[in-house]
Amino acid sequence: MRLVFAGTPEPALPSLQRLIDSARHDVIAVLTRPDAAAGRRGRPSPSPVAELAAAHGIPVLKPPRPNSEEFVAELAALAPDCCAVVAYGALLREELLAVPALGWVNLHFSVLPAWRGAAPVQAALAAGDEVTGATTFQIELSLDSGPVYGVVTETIRPTDTAGDLLGRLAESGAGLLEATMDGIEDGTLTAVPQPAEGVSIAPKVSVDDARIRWELPAHVVDRRIRSVTPNPGAWTMAGELRIKVGPVTVPDDGPKDLEPGEIRVGKKHVHVGTATDAVLLGTVQPPGKKSMNAADWARGARAEDIRRAR
């Protein structure tokens, strides 16, 4: 099939590469978001998908308004049979959806109808789900609600961060997307409506959402931190410093008398109290510095910065 691939960040790369390598499909163009500021100097930089497409000599489309009449006409002129989407980053309107004869197929990183929205991996981890997955479905106007072509599942491991889990789903989802494209081309695959029950929403995670709430139980603090690692990154105030906090553990032999947010510094360990057990900090990143061992940070910190996290 003649395919246009729409995607932007790194998790979309395995899917694009699978379709490029496929002997059955021809990726005739890539649709991605416009160059965005990156690095300390904030210079505009192409998306990971744009870079991979350019490396393979595939035309790259970066419309600032993908639903504009001008871009709808530009896409129609390419005459794609189908458009595949992985984390493109913009909602598509009716006129654009009508361009390819076989529609638009999205790879979404959850088992729909669970966790529709922008942050399904983060939501699954924060909720304490034991299993998640990836789904291919036909895009409709309403958010992530279209009929489903296929699903793969993935067990969530106790130490998974969002980065870990998304990396595995990006790989397994790439195979699912290729198989879905094959089935659509063959006419052997039929999309099945999503069930009305079990719908949940996963909105985009903001920096404010990533602030650690030490008044929650330890196991909730643990999974909420992992759900925003590496991005946007969990953080807390320690004294007057805003520090990023890496994944924590909940040791059986940790102190039992700490109040939520109270910090206790040992020779080799730093514990912080929660609503239940204390958690053991692994790494922290103070402002303007690289990530470091929490105990090393505490030894060099001011006394007022290591009394309480909030």
UniProtKB/Swiss-Prot annotation:
GO terms for cellular component: cytosol. Its EC number is 2.1.2.9. Residues 299-310 have a biased composition (Basic and acidic residues). (6S)-5,6,7,8-tetrahydrofolate binds at residues 110-113. GO terms for molecular function: methionyl-tRNA formyltransferase activity. It catalyses: L-methionyl-tRNA(fMet) + (6R)-10-formyltetrahydrofolate = N-formyl-L-methionyl-tRNA(fMet) + (6S)-5,6,7,8-tetrahydrofolate + H(+). Pfam families: Formyl_trans_C (PF02911), Formyl_trans_N (PF00551). Keywords: Protein biosynthesis, Transferase. SUPFAM superfamilies: FMT C-terminal domain-like (SSF50486), Formyltransferase (SSF53328). Residues 283-310 are annotated as: Disordered. Attaches a formyl group to the free amino group of methionyl-tRNA(fMet). The formyl group appears to play a dual role in the initiator identity of N-formylmethionyl-tRNA by promoting its recognition by IF2 and preventing the misappropriation of this tRNA by the elongation apparatus. Belongs to the Fmt family. This is Methionyl-tRNA formyltransferase. It comes from Mycolicibacterium gilvum (strain PYR-GCK) (Mycobacterium gilvum (strain PYR-GCK)). The gene is fmt.
